[in-house]
Amino acid sequence: TNVKESEFIAEGAAGR
């Protein structure tokens, strides 16, 4: 995963 995907996954984990 790259930085962009990492940020997307982080937001998804936050329930956004």
From Swiss-Prot:
One of its GO terms (cellular component) is extracellular region. The keyword Protein biosynthesis does not apply. The keyword Coiled coil applies. It is found in: Secreted. Keywords: Adaptive immunity, Blood coagulation, Coiled coil, Disulfide bond, Hemostasis, Immunity, Innate immunity, Secreted. Conversion of fibrinogen to fibrin is triggered by thrombin, which cleaves fibrinopeptides A and B from alpha and beta chains, and thus exposes the N-terminal polymerization sites responsible for the formation of the soft clot. The soft clot is converted into the hard clot by factor XIIIA which catalyzes the epsilon-(gamma-glutamyl)lysine cross-linking between gamma chains (stronger) and between alpha chains (weaker) of different monomers. Forms F13A-mediated cross-links between a glutamine and the epsilon-amino group of a lysine residue, forming fibronectin-fibrinogen heteropolymers. One of its GO terms (biological process) is blood coagulation. A long coiled coil structure formed by 3 polypeptide chains connects the central nodule to the C-terminal domains (distal nodules). The long C-terminal ends of the alpha chains fold back, contributing a fourth strand to the coiled coil structure. Cleaved by the protease thrombin to yield monomers which, together with fibrinogen beta (FGB) and fibrinogen gamma (FGG), polymerize to form an insoluble fibrin matrix. Fibrin has a major function in hemostasis as one of the primary components of blood clots. In addition, functions during the early stages of wound repair to stabilize the lesion and guide cell migration during re-epithelialization. Was originally thought to be essential for platelet aggregation, based on in vitro studies using anticoagulated blood. Heterohexamer; disulfide linked. Contains 2 sets of 3 non-identical chains (alpha, beta and gamma). The 2 heterotrimers are in head to head conformation with the N-termini in a small central domain. This is Fibrinogen alpha chain. The gene is FGA.
